[in-house]
């Protein structure tokens, strides 16, 4: 097969995958589709994937078991700095740098996180929303910020979440919708729906 045809087929494949990411709205179903079609290097069990964008090289991404990835997360598998250097010097001696991203068991990644190439996120870790992960994340930690730094522990967040869950009186995950939970533990704003102060 000639190079031009390979490039065209690759573009069609990429556009089809992107279409699927936009049309499959449920994170569980999206992860199952990615796993079924072997888009990533590996996807374990109980993976929840909500981003609408796939990494440029999805085969460089490995998601272990019980991983939840929120909307807007970008998994960056390469740096295009080489393009800038090649154009600057009118050469082709600089090669694009690629790196794997491996996300271990029991990891939650918050909304709009950017994970850079070559990063491993250790087991039992949480990445706070908006973080930019430039280095490996140690096991059992919570990281946040730009660049991401350790700001807490996984076990502390787990304990706080359990304590908050107990406020709902023994209801278990998945039994009720948000509106049902708000009847048990109401949330009050300082203004009503019409903008009037309470």
PLM features per residue range, with description:
Residues 25, 94-109, 114, 148-198:
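C-terminal segments of enzyme domains that contribute to small-molecule binding surfaces
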Residues 45, 65, 104-105, 120-124, ...:
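Structural motif
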Residues 111-127, 131-135:
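Beta-rich strand-turn-strand
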Residues 30-34, 50-120, 146-147, 153-155:
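Flexible, glycine/small-residue-enriched loop-and-beta-strand segment within the central core
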Residues 1-40:
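Membrane-proximal basic amphipathic "stem/tether" segments
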Residues 47-49, 127:
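Hydrophobic, membrane-inserted alpha-helices
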């Amino acid at each position: 097969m000639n190079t031009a045809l390979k490039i065209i087929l690759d573009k069609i494949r990429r556009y089809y995958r992107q279409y699927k990411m936009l049309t499959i709205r449920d994170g569980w179903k999206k992860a199952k589709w990615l796993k079924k079609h072997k888009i990533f290097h590996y996807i374990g069990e109980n993976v929840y994937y909500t981003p609408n964008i796939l990494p440029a090289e999805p085969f460089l991404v490995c998601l272990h078991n019980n991983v939840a990835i929120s909307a807007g997360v970008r998994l960056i598998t390469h740096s295009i700095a080489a393009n800038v250097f090649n154009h600057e010097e009118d050469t082709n001696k600089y090669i694009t740098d690629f790196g794997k991203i491996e996300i271990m068991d029991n990891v939650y990644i918050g909304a709009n996180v950017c994970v850079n190439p070559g990063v491993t996120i250790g087991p039992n870790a949480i990445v706070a929303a908006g973080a930019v992960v430039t280095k490996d994340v140690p096991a059992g930690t919570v990281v946040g910020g730009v660049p991401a730094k350790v700001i807490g522990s996984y076990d502390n967040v787990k304990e706080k979440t359990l304590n908050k869950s107990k406020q709902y009186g023994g209801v278990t995950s998945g039994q009720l919708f948000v509106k049902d939970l708000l009847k048990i533990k109401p949330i009050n704003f300082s203004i009503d729906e019409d903008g009037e102060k309470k």
